[in-house]
Every structure is written in structure tokens, then in C-alpha cells.
């Protein structure tokens, strides 16, 4: 058995994760330290902050608390297995399977394992909409007069 130790001190095998292994403190801590976009931003922007922004946007749109929670948790698996940028992730089918399995366990823990296809598409919509401005604004936000 290959175990990981979480921020809270719990030990478990992420390949055999159960809903009882899920602790929001572990997810929140890890996501707060994980930079979006592989760190290729003008300033540090955590996956945790992005998740909060997605949930806040869902609330602003008048979506249900269930949908807000789904938005908050949409990257929660990355709290256990980190993040890989989208252009690379699509080529890693084994990683995608592991990520999906862990995400399913997390959703079960929070009572969201029965999300409809429409509900899943809604959080993906916000994720994409919030991702785009970060990609374009933060990646290109600085101009430098330094020429080497």
C-alpha cells in the first residue's frame, strides 16, 4: 500500500481513497498552496482562490447552494494529486482516470455524487469563463522595458 500523509496528518492510499478519507481542511490547505496555470502567471493565483471565485460567481448568478458547492469543489481532487495544465492533461488518460475516481469519492463525501450532466456542465462553464480572463490578463499583464 502506497500512502500519502495529508496536512491534517491522516494517512491513506490515494488509489484506494474512500469518502472517509476526505477532509475539507486538507483540500483547502493544499489548494491554497497550488498555483494555477503551472505557475506561469504574473502573480501567485491559487487553485483555492480560483475555486472560491467560481463558487462566488455561481452565487452571484443565483444558482442553488448545491451548485455553488459543486463549483467550490470542482478542482478538489487537485488537493490530493496536484494539478497538470490542461494542454498536457488531455494526453494523460491514466491521470484522468485517477483524477475522476478521486473526484467521485470527494463528491460522494459531500453528497454531490448524483450531479446531473446539466449541473456538471454548469460548473465547467464557470470554470472556463473564469479561467479565460486569468489566462489572458495575468499572463500578459506586465510589460517590461528590460531587453537582454
Language-model regions, residue ranges each:
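Divalent metal-dependent catalytic cores for phosphoryl transfer on phosphate-bearing substrates
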Residues: 63-136
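N- or domain-start disorder-to-order transition segments that initiate the globular core
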Residues: 8-22
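Active-site flanking loop/helix segments enriched in acidic
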Residues: 25-46
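Conserved small/polar residues in nucleotide/adenosyl-binding loops
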Residues: 137-144
